[in-house]
Amino acid sequence: MSFLIVLAALAFLMLAAYRGYSVILFAPIAALGAVLLTDPGAVAPVFSGIFMEKLVGFVKLYFPVFLLGAVFGKLIEISGFSESIVVAAIRYIGRTRANAVIVLVCALLTYGGVSLFVVVFAVYPFAAELYRQSNIPKRLMPGAIALGAFSFTMDTLPGTPQIQNIIPTTFFKTTGWAAPWLGVIGSVAMLTAGLIYLEWRRRTVMATGEGYGGSAAEANAENQPKAPRSGLPHPLLSIAPLVLVGVVNYALTKMIPHWYGDNYALTADALPGLHSAINLPIKGVIGIWAVEGALLLGIVFVVVTAFGRVRAAFAEGTKAAVGGALLAAMNTASEYGFGGVIAALPGFLAVSSALKSVPDPLINAAVSVTTLAGITGSASGGMSIALAAMSDQFIRAAESAQIPLEVLHRVVSMASGGMDTLPHNGAVITLLAVTGLTHKQSYGEIFGITVIKTLAVFFVIAVYYLTGLV
């Protein structure tokens, strides 16, 4: 019975997400409903002592990353930098390679620190015009955007500032550059397989005589492709803040330990108002601080170099970015609190025991994380639930098998971006809404990319065991 309660809570949350209901509201309802069925008297203590503690802890650690990433992405958009990058990519790579152009631009923006949701809005108008001029069926476009924005630059390529690569740093005391060789190998494999798949789909569909086509939703003015604005910034200037974020992120990862050591004690000598000293283990925040510092410098760079363009839309743009960051952070934090509650239930012991039956530590972690990401429809949410419930188990198993925690970080991060893009995933729903397409028209290609992403993590595990590369 206790096992069925856990399954019911997970199924309820998945259904709520699929139906479009707010996870912020329904994650605590699902968690506390499970507690009510287990021990009615524990509902209030669990809510305050577990759910809210986990939620607040997540927000404390990660909200600045969500906020700075959203603001940076919005400034890249309103400055014209993202538009300039798209136009330059089309000019230099060519319209005949539409899939490669869109994948490259999306990858460049996400690896440079732009939120994947912002990338969808920024790239779509120009992607639509490119596909129209090349007479490539529009319904293939979401697959290309998914490969560029929702895959290797989100969780696999070393140093990516996306939250899916940052969350593991606090659990495993690693950095965003964990397991660089495995990350590069996994990224190349994912990109290569994805491009081959998309090109095969393009040839297959166009062989039937299908062209760009259209949809009823395209009548909506928001979804109409638009011509590039005049007077766009130079492409080299446009790409500079993305490069800056990557370079500063790497530099701070190396420099922060030298500045602060292993632990930093903040005492009343420095701040007389402190009632007691604050001891902060630095290793657990290196990855977060490095990304925050890099994004902050990226924001300053964009404001300074594109002040004329940014000034007019700065107030409204940053207001929208803050709203988006709050929503994204609270969604994931609620799922993290849900995971903490579920992990405390007796029924979860059965789940944990079943997962322990998978003897290999890396496969165990990969299956656990990607399954929960699929159930919740969220890479960061599924990973948060898994790590809230099983991170200690993962660490013990890896250390027992003498597997570096860097490898575990990379596997967990990649696994979170495996089955997350099922039909109820928020990014998938947003992508289809922005492009004016339906699941029936375009989810097939997105699912193909989902399969490639899921298989890639097991390919990387095999590479590690065969070569020992980290």
What are these regions (language model features)?
Residues R19-V23, V59-Y62, G73-E83, L109-A122, ...:
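Short helix-coil transition sites and intra-membrane helix breaks within transmembrane domains
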Residues F63-G69, Y92-E129, A329-G337, V358-R396:
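Hydrophobic alpha-helical transmembrane segments of multi-pass integral membrane proteins
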Residues A128-I239, A427-Y464, G468:
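Membrane-core helix-loop-helix motifs of multi-pass transport proteins
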